[in-house]
Amino acid sequence: MQRLSLPAPAKLNRMLHIVGRRADGYHELQTLFQFLDRSDTLHFSPRADGAIHLAPAIADVDHDANLIVRAARLLQHASGTHQGVDIHLDKRLPMGGGLGGGSSDAATTLLALDRLWSLDLGLPRLAELGLTLGADVPVFVRGHSAWAEGIGERLTPVTLDTPWFVVIHPGEEIATPAVFGHPELTRDTPPISMARALRGGAEQGRAWRNDCEAVVRRLSPDVAHALDWLSAFGPAMLTGTGSCLFCPLTSERQADRILRRVGSHWHAFKARGCNTSPLHDALGIHDEWSPMSQYGDA
């Protein structure tokens, strides 16, 4: 195989509750992950000398610290292969926006090189490796909408509705440590069952919420303003720790109408929700997971 070009899709946190804090400082979460049909694109070309090269350079990110390079080297080490790769990144997803771009790029790298280098490690092992790179990487490896607990690594596949979304990036990054380290962050939301979470989004509208929103509003008046503006069209929310915001909509036409009204000072796009990752679709992967229905069991 000479070359692979694959998507690294965005994700949304359709809801995000912080239910505790561990002794090691990590936060215990409950969240619903869903993919979007908007992606970065990575191009992989094998090399025989074992070198890992990534281009173009990303401002303020050291080459060797980039999650893409780290994922490639992790896979080399775990498999014992001496193969290398040239990687070209076409970046479309904003950095620091809560869309999971870096984690998704890392997951795409793991799956691409598993295929390109003929390693056949399997999704469970690749997800295990991905977790050492970041808590969001496993859901991108497994490739299905999921209910997540723990620090985000305990995953149960689910089937969600797949509306159109308008996503707004107000133009700034929100540092995750600034949010999770904020003294006013809610850290004691009572845990709920997965089935209740799934029913809540369908039956109660605004029942899906993001516990990070209040802190992000304090940290960024621009995000607060954009969120208030988008909320006029539906149940707008923050994804992850921000700064991207999203609003589920009933039709692409409605999304187009909203996009025409977005000010030029905000970057915005429309995307469709997906239950199966565009990466898995591109690779023809059919995971062994058996998702629950949209509303779950009682």
From Swiss-Prot:
Pathway: Isoprenoid biosynthesis; isopentenyl diphosphate biosynthesis via DXP pathway; isopentenyl diphosphate from 1-deoxy-D-xylulose 5-phosphate: step 3/6
UniProt key word Nucleotide-binding: yes
Chemical reaction(s) catalysed: 4-CDP-2-C-methyl-D-erythritol + ATP = 4-CDP-2-C-methyl-D-erythritol 2-phosphate + ADP + H(+)
Enzyme class: transferase
Active site: 11, 136
Chain residues that bind ATP: 94-104
Alphabetized SUPFAM superfamilies for the sequence: GHMP Kinase, C-terminal domain (SSF55060), Ribosomal protein S5 domain 2-like (SSF54211)
E.C. designation(s): 2.7.1.148
An individual GO BP term: terpenoid biosynthetic process
Molecular functions (GO terms): 4-(cytidine 5'-diphospho)-2-C-methyl-D-erythritol kinase activity; ATP binding
Keyword Transferase belongs to the record: yes
Keywords: ATP-binding, Isoprene biosynthesis, Kinase, Nucleotide-binding, Transferase
NCBIfam families membership: ispE
PANTHER family in the cross-refs: 4-DIPHOSPHOCYTIDYL-2-C-METHYL-D-ERYTHRITOL KINASE, CHLOROPLASTIC (PTHR43527:SF2)
Similarity comment text for this entry: Belongs to the GHMP kinase family. IspE subfamily.
Entry function: Catalyzes the phosphorylation of the position 2 hydroxy group of 4-diphosphocytidyl-2C-methyl-D-erythritol.
Protein name: 4-diphosphocytidyl-2-C-methyl-D-erythritol kinase
Gene source species: Chromohalobacter salexigens (strain ATCC BAA-138 / DSM 3043 / CIP 106854 / NCIMB 13768 / 1H11)
